[in-house]
């Protein structure tokens, strides 16, 4: 494989990756935490919607609700990060250079 072909292949892969990442960032992903908190996030890590089961809302114990919301969002973000990494790895297979 000559250098020009390799450069063209890399440019094509970069365009494909940019397109797929842009699609990923616009897509909405829904998560449910213990059937009590539902979150909808975009792939760009923006929260679109947050629904809290009314049974969780206790004016005398806001800390529990805050902790659960934090945990729900962190779980959703962690899953999105994993999906983004899987997408990136599926688009850019390792390039093998002769002699290395």
Swiss-Prot record:
InterPro entries: YbaB-like_sf, YbaB/EbfC. GO terms for cellular component: bacterial nucleoid; cytosol. Keywords: Cytoplasm, DNA-binding. GO terms for molecular function: DNA binding. Its main location: cytoplasm. It is found in: Cytoplasm, Nucleoid. SUPFAM superfamilies: YbaB-like. Transmembrane segments: none annotated. The keyword Transcription does not apply. Binds to DNA and alters its conformation. May be involved in regulation of gene expression, nucleoid organization and DNA protection. HAMAP family: DNA_YbaB_EbfC (MF_00274). NCBIfam families: DNA_YbaB_EbfC. Belongs to the YbaB/EbfC family. PANTHER family: NUCLEOID-ASSOCIATED PROTEIN YBAB (PTHR33449:SF1). This is Nucleoid-associated protein MYCGA6000.
């Amino acid at each position: 494989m000559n250098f020009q072909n390799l450069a063209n292949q890399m440019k094509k892969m970069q365009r494909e990756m940019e397109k797929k990442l842009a699609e990923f960032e616009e897509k909405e992903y829904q998560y449910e935490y213990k059937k009590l908190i539902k979150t909808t996030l975009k792939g760009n890590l923006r929260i679109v919607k947050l629904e809290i089961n009314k049974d969780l809302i206790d004016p005398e114990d806001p800390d529990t609700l805050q902790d659960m919301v934090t945990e729900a969002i962190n779980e959703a973000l962690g899953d999105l990060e994993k999906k983004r990494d899987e997408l990136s790895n599926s688009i850019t297979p390792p390039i093998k250079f002769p002699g290395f």
